[in-house]
């Protein structure tokens, strides 16, 4: 998949997630954290001109923070939001994980 198409798809999937979570917000701190995560990555994706490792690291960071909030946080996602998250999750594993390059020593925990 070419860079521009990948950026467009990532932006669309995160936008879909953003729209879906608007219907299940409860005003909890985790809702605010998730919204902040989404806003940050949408801003980064919008200004990105090419797919480089810095953007891949941003996408990975977004994925890790959001995954933690959804898995262990107090978020109550409806079916639409859960489906939107699963769609992004699949995209992330198919297109981001294997392309991301980490530098320096990496230790498994």
What positions do the PLM features span?
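Amphipathic alpha-helical binding modules
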Residues: 64-109
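Non-transmembrane alpha-helical oligomerization segments
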Residues: 17, 27, 59, 92-95
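Amphipathic alpha-helical interaction modules
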Residues: 21-72
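Short terminal alpha-helical segments
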Residues: 1-39, 100-109
């Amino acid at each position: 998949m070419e860079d521009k198409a990948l950026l467009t798809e990532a932006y669309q999937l995160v936008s879909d997630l953003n729209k879906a979570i608007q219907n299940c917000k409860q005003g909890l701190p985790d809702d605010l954290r998730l919204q902040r995560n989404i806003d940050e990555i949408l801003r980064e994706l919008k200004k990105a001109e090419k797919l480089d490792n810095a953007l891949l690291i941003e996408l990975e960071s977004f994925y890790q923070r959001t995954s933690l909030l959804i898995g262990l946080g107090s978020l109550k996602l409806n079916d639409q939001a859960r489906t939107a998250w699963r769609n992004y999750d699949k995209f992330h594993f198919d297109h981001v994980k294997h392309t991301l390059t980490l530098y320096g020593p990496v230790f498994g925990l």
